Structures are given as C-alpha cells and as structure tokens.
Regions:
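Active-site-proximal or metal-binding-adjacent scaffold patches in catalytic folds
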Residues: 1-154, 163-206
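Walker B catalytic acidic pair
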Residues: 159
Length: 206
C-alpha cells in the first residue's frame, strides 16, 4: 500500500529486475525477484512514488470516463463503428463478420502493396491488434470488428508491411505511410478505444 493505493506484489525466480505496472483495470503490480530484499523493494517504490501517483490519477480519470461510457452502451455493441443491439450478436457472429471483411480486403491490399501472406487467423483475447509471424502468418484481434473500417485497413497495412520489413524501422513506417497516409491518427484512435472495445465484447455470449 502506498498512500491508499493498493499494490499487488508478484515474486518469481524468473523475474530479474524490479518493475512497476498499472493495468487498465487500475491494479498496481510490483514485480520483483525472489532474492530481492524488502528494503530494496520499499526504496524502489519510494523512487517511483511521484510517477505512480501521477500515472494512477490520470488512468483513474480515464477509467471513470470508460465506465461512464460503458453505461451508455448497455446492451449495445459496435460493428464497424455502428451501434447495434448486443442481443442480436454472439462472439461467433462477430468473428464471422470480421473474417468476411478480412477475406475481402487482405488480398486486395496485399496485391496493392505487392506482397503476400501465408494465411490469417482471428483471436478472441489477443493482447495486440495484429501480428505477423516470421513465416508471414497474420493474426488479428476480434475487437477490431468494433472499429471503423478505415482503422481496420490500417492494421491490415501495418501487418502486411511486416511481411516486407520484420521490424519497426524507418523503412517499415515509410511503407505504412505510403499506403495509409493518416496512419498516425488511426493508430492513436485505436489506442484510445481498444480497452473500450474489449469491454464491449465481454457482454456477449460465445
């Protein structure tokens, strides 16, 4: 506990250094090696106190806004940024909808970018919006079905760019910008709404 902020401590032999994280649900987690003395952990928390309080307060405000917004979306879901009745959809339905869209757009965008991919999959609980393996297997988060189509296209372009550049180098971002000039705005919008989308999907049945 630090000034009424509860802290969850996780100790493990696999953890090599002290770290402090705040989850989207406002849980503060202190990760520490098994061998770390309590005095060192306390000193580390003291060092991070100013950052923790500032960040926690900022996230608390965002979380409050999120809860307020979710209340206005009770029994509602977004499908391609359009408000729909949540009772009319299951997660399986949304997966089919996103799959159909990706099946249509992926080949077209890949052809435009003069690249190719092995296949793609959709993950319900993905921690990232999209990914591209070394063998060009693409993966997309189901929550993208809530986003506007232009934002989904940005994620497609982002992952297809990884079939050409396997990192986030300047050449990678140049490639993304060629095919998605406003990618920065779309990326920021997704970043701001990803937790909201994930919470919307939680109310649906499989």
């Amino acid at each position: 506990m630090l000034d009424d902020i509860p802290i969850t401590i996780q100790k493990s032999k696999k953890i090599k250094t002290l770290s402090l994280n705040i989850t989207p649900s406002l849980e503060v987690i202190l990760k520490m090696p098994d061998s770390c003395p309590q005095a060192r952990a306390s000193a580390f928390l003291k060092e991070q106190e100013a950052w923790l309080k500032k960040t926690f307060l900022s996230m608390q405000e965002k979380y409050s806004l999120l809860r307020s917004r979710l209340e206005t979306y009770q029994n509602k879901i977004l499908v391609f940024d359009e408000v729909k009745n949540a009772n009319d959809y299951t997660l399986t339905d949304l997966k089919k909808i996103l799959k159909t869209y990706l099946e249509q757009k992926l080949p077209l965008i890949a052809q435009k970018m003069q690249t190719s991919y092995t296949h793609f999959s959709i993950r319900n609980n993905a921690k990232v919006l999209g990914s591209c393996s070394y063998h060009n297997r693409l993966s997309f988060a189901l929550l993208l079905v809530c986003a506007q189509k232009e934002a989904i296209d940005y994620v497609i372009i982002h992952e297809l760019a990884h079939t050409i550049h396997k990192n986030h180098s300047q050449n990678f971002w140049r490639c993304v910008q060629i095919f998605c000039p406003n990618y920065r705005a779309l990326r920021e919008r997704l970043k701001q709404r990803v937790v909201f989308y994930a919470q919307l999907l939680k109310q649906l049945q499989p």
